[in-house]
Design a protein with these regions (language model features):
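ABC family nucleotide-binding domain
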Residues: 3-224
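C-terminal boundary and immediately downstream tail of ABC-type ATPase nucleotide-binding domains
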Residues: 221, 225-247
């Protein structure tokens, strides 16, 4: 883990009078899995969206794989091709089949011919265990299956980094495991991942680092063992203890 994939330096973001991010700095190395936790409204999702510039910070700088994305001269669309993002509400096109959704970026963004795009998309559908659902439309899939299609769509673009914004929060409890299993497989394969999630079991088992945010700042960060068994701050212990009861 000696190659830096994400570097955030003094990130600030406000919406009107509300300062959501108050000078966040964070570095993530290649192959690292980092889980962001914290109360609602703490700025976790905003920070995640600053990484690929879906949200533009008011102040601060963002680097991904050595490229400064906050540099106005950077081709942000080109940079985003290498950053996968999975949202809590799937963001699939309902008029396309599962494999059509996975192929879309390959044909429209990368310019692959249909045969090559289909082959690459099918490989990722197999990877997430949905090869039997290639011709199904999103309306015919469970929430867990939709999220796995969304993950396959990101993976098909061969990203160097995956961002997950509460990928299981919209799912029925019995469907959460199938999505977490895919995420675990990605982590074991060495994918660099930044995840906003309260799935503490996943964080304990898979992550290298847990980052606790509150009030727009990083309160504490450390290994899962340190954060879950022996955090330095009472507030960290209180919050992680509470969400551990439910996850």
């Amino acid at each position: 883990m000696d190659k830096q994939i994400i570097k955030l330096e003094n990130i600030h973001k406000a919406y009107g009078d509300e300062e959501v991010l108050k000078g966040i700095s964070l570095e993530i190395m290649e192959g690292e899995v980092v889980v962001l936790v914290g109360p609602s409204g703490t700025g976790k999702s905003t920070l995640l969206r600053c990484v690929n510039q879906l949200t533009i910070p008011d102040q601060g700088r963002v680097w991904v794989n050595g490229m400064e994305l906050t540099d106005p001269s950077v081709d942000i669309n080109l940079a985003r091709q290498h950053i996968g993002m999975v949202f809590q509400d799937f963001n699939l096109f309902n008029h396309l089949t599962s494999i059509g959704n996975v192929m879309l970026g390959l044909t429209k963004v990368l310019g692959l011919k249909a045969d090559a795009a289909y082959e690459r998309a099918m490989k990722e559908m197999v990877r997430v265990g949905l090869q039997e659902k290639c011709d199904s439309y999103p309306g015919q899939l469970s929430g867990g299956q939709k999220q796995r299609v969304a993950i396959a769509r990101s993976l098909a673009m061969d990203p160097i980094l995956m961002l997950f914004d509460e990928p299981t929060s919209a799912l029925d409890p019995e469907l959460i495991g199938e999505v977490l299993a895919v995420m675990k497989d990605l982590a074991l394969a060495g994918m660099t991942m930044l995840c906003v999630t309260h799935e503490i079991g996943f964080a304990r088992e898979v992550s290298n680092r847990i980052v606790f945010m509150e009030g727009g700042v990083i309160v504490e960060e450390g290994t899962p063992k340190q954060m879950l068994q022996n955090p330095k701050l009472e507030r960290t212990k209180q919050f992680l203890g509470k969400i551990s009861e439910f996850h």
